[in-house]
From Swiss-Prot:
Disulfide topology: none
Sorted UniProt keywords: ANK repeat, Repeat
Keyword Repeat assigned: yes
Sequence ranges of the ANK repeats: 12-41, 189-218, 249-278, 336-365, 367-393, 394-423
Source species, domain of life: Viruses
Database matches in Gene3D superfamilies: Ankyrin repeat-containing domain (1.25.40.20)
Keyword Ubl conjugation attached: no
Listed name of the protein: Putative ankyrin repeat protein R580
Length: 468
């Protein structure tokens, strides 16, 4: 008695003629029971375009596991047929029902098997729309496969076109989306695509859609203003009245223009007649390369920020030192300086922080010992100490937090500057245990830490931190 199996391989580890597996090849083949799967099933479920399928006759006493565990058992089998997937004639003798043909075509699309697709695309049972949806959704499918499918059926219903175009845009298959739109120029599809292109900052696609009749609105233009894309904005404004844009969305427009951080964008819309006032400082992108020149334009127009605003706080931690120098000259109130100093130190912009201190910011403005506003890290603590931060007010709080969170380098520099900590015994036990486990692997088994007093634990922690 005997039975039939299929062997599937996709590489050079297996010799289909002699049924021999090279070293390491055992894990690169599949052995399929023919009673469970037909040949076409094996192809669709297990094969790639580069695969081959060997139909073998196997003695009844051999199982699949025995064949995989000991490749020498394959010598007891007989090759009945070999099917190479890259040989198009393999499929000629197959009986392909409607559902099977559909599955095979999906397999061909996913494997970029262009010749096989061409063989069957004229079949009346093939739905090009379904194959396109399958191909577009799979990032491994090449554009030339999708273009082939489109060449067989260019025209779709409006809802079908919208679905395919949306899929293309989500998968960033822009050229295929353009082709679909050119063949199926439904106004609703074009307009919805422009919504997507604008929100996704796809300038090239947006221009294509405008050229193909898309209706432009304020939101489309605002999207490209926000990213500083002046070319696309000007192109759209050739088809949309500038004054209408200014009148319809003045507040959103001013915010978008200044948030773009683009000098050219700001100058362009000021020249168009956009009205501006001191509120533009709230929207300005302070980390832009153009910020310095933008501020000079505002100064030339005698537009200044309010002295009690958050402008300095919002800008100081991200702007260049040159921009900061201009802002400081606006004479903000003391609270603005102090809040800006906190945000700048916490952001690690220490040069800017030094300039704020030089200009009048107070590093000790917060005299509440239970509320330190600064982040705990070594560079920040060092900066505070170097600039006469009052450790008597906040030092103990910062040291406690440093120890409890394992910031031992911060704790060390604070201890070196005379700061004492104030913690409960349970907190001291946790700190000591964590330190020992981190730096020594374990606590000395001969030491009963629970029997130690708080003072004894403090001394041990001091010694460990200083000698770390």
């Amino acid at each position: 008695m005997s039975k039939t199996y299929y062997i599937i391989s996709t590489n050079d580890y297996f010799d289909p003629i002699n049924l021999s597996i090279k070293d390491g090849g055992e894990k690169t083949i599949d052995i399929i029971d023919c009673e469970r799967y037909t040949l076409i099933d094996c192809i669709i479920f297990f094969c790639k375009k580069e695969s081959f399928v060997i139909e073998i006759i196997v003695p009844d006493f051999l199982t699949k596991d025995k064949l995989l565990c000991d490749s020498e058992n394959l010598s007891l089998c007989v090759v009945n047929n070999i099917y190479y997937m890259n040989d198009i004639s393999v499929f000629d003798s197959m009986s392909l029902e409607k559902s099977t043909l559909k599955s095979l075509m999906n397999w061909a699309v996913k494997n970029n098997y262009k010749v096989l697709l061409q063989k069957y695309l004229d079949n009346q049972n093939i739905k090009i729309y379904d194959l396109l949806a399958c191909g577009i959704s799979n990032s491994n499918v090449c554009d030339n496969i999708l273009e082939l499918l489109l060449s067989y059926c260019k025209y779709f219903q409006e809802n079908e076109t919208m679905f395919l175009v949306s899929f293309c845009l989500e998968m960033h298959r822009i050229d295929i989306a353009k082709t679909l739109i050119m063949y199926n120029s439904y106004p609703s599809v074009i307009n919805k695509s422009l919504n997507f292109a604008s929100k996704s900052n796809m300038s090239e696609l947006a221009i294509f859609l405008v050229d193909n009749g898309a209706e432009i609105n304020c939101d489309h233009i605002l999207c490209f203003i926000r990213i500083g894309d002046i070319d696309t904005v000007l192109y759209m404004l050739c088809r949309y009245d500038v004054q209408k844009l200014i009148d319809r969305c003045h507040f959103d427009l001013v915010e978008a223009v200044f948030n773009s951080g683009s000098l050219e964008m700001i100058e362009t819309f000021i020249d168009f007649g956009m009205k501006i006032n001191s509120k533009v400082y709230q929207h300005l992108k302070y980390d832009s390369k153009d910020t310095y020149e933008i501020l000079r334009i505002l100064l030339a127009r005698e537009i200044y920020p309010r002295k009690c605003s958050d402008v300095l706080k919002n800008a100081a931690h991200i702007c260049s030192i040159d921009v900061l120098k201009i802002l400081v000259d606006f004479e903000f109130n003391q609270k603005s300086f102090d809040n800006a100093l906190v945000s700048t130190i916490n952001a690690g912009k220490f040069k800017n922080a030094e300039y704020l201190l030089f200009s009048g910011a107070n590093i000790n403005f917060n005299n509440m010992p239970t509320n330190c506003m600064f982040k705990i890290n070594f560079q920040t603590i060092k900066f505070l100490i170097d600039n006469n931060f009052d450790l008597e007010i906040h030092g103990t709080l910062i040291l406690n937090k440093s120890l409890l969170n394992g910031y031992y380098d911060c704790a060390n520099i604070l201890i070196e500057n005379g700061v004492k900590f104030s913690l409960t015994k349970s907190e001291l036990l946790k700190i000591y245990s964590d330190f020992q486990n981190t730096h020594h692997g374990q606590i000395d088994p001969e030491l009963n830490i629970n029997s130690l007093t708080s003072d004894e634990l403090e001394n041990l922690i001091y010694i460990d931190i200083v000698n770390k």
